[in-house]
Amino acid sequence: MEGWQRAFVLHSRPWSETSLMLDVFTEESGRVRLVAKGARSKRSTLKGALQPFTPLLLRFGGRGEVKTLRSAEAVSLALPLSGITLYSGLYINELLSRVLEYETRFSELFFDYLHCIQSLAGATGTPEPALRRFELALLGHLGYGVNFTHCAGSGEPVDGTMTYRYREEKGFIASVVIDNKTFTGRQLKALNAREFPDADTLRAAKRFTRMALKPYLGGKPLKSRELFRQFMPKRTVKTHYE
């Protein structure tokens, strides 16, 4: 793949005294691992561009699992993330690194990612709605199809006044039992619309996406959450990550 592709760096680390190993998300090739030779040298013009949240054009090639970066250009300055929006951006980057296979095309997800970080950059309040929409979009692209509009047991449309319990691989079934797997019909309608008008629907969306993403993430904790807990005020941590 030698043509130019739109891309974002998800993560980078030193590979040698002068090179970087990059985990990138591209429009056409999906997630790709690249070696950026010479990117750490003092004379390199790439070092400043190969950063998370900077829209890039990349050209790369090679036959193995690890490709070689041929050229890179920053399309614009990095999207301005700071504080809680920066940690939110690091979270979605880590999420993609954990759940996406290498070199599997996700062109629509690429634009969902772009829209998410643009929303984070422009956020004046909580970043949670943008995060929940992205998580739901990611689950959809991974093939995790869930029907939020109809009861999996009866086939009847979801009633906003009723309670439904989530069952993996089946969907939501009307239930009188209330536990961490139950959702109100109103909450399910909010999930389906990807609109979260209040704290109740946001909490429900977080609860569902945590539950649905767990099989993809396994038991290994996300480093971005740990960083968030270390460096952000406790009240903010509880509000956004608990």
UniProtKB/Swiss-Prot annotation:
One of its GO terms (biological process) is double-strand break repair. The keyword DNA-binding does not apply. The keyword DNA damage applies. Gene3D superfamilies: Nucleic acid-binding proteins, Recombination protein O, C-terminal domain. GO terms for cellular component: bacterial nucleoid. Belongs to the RecO family. Monomer. This is DNA repair protein RecO. The gene is recO.
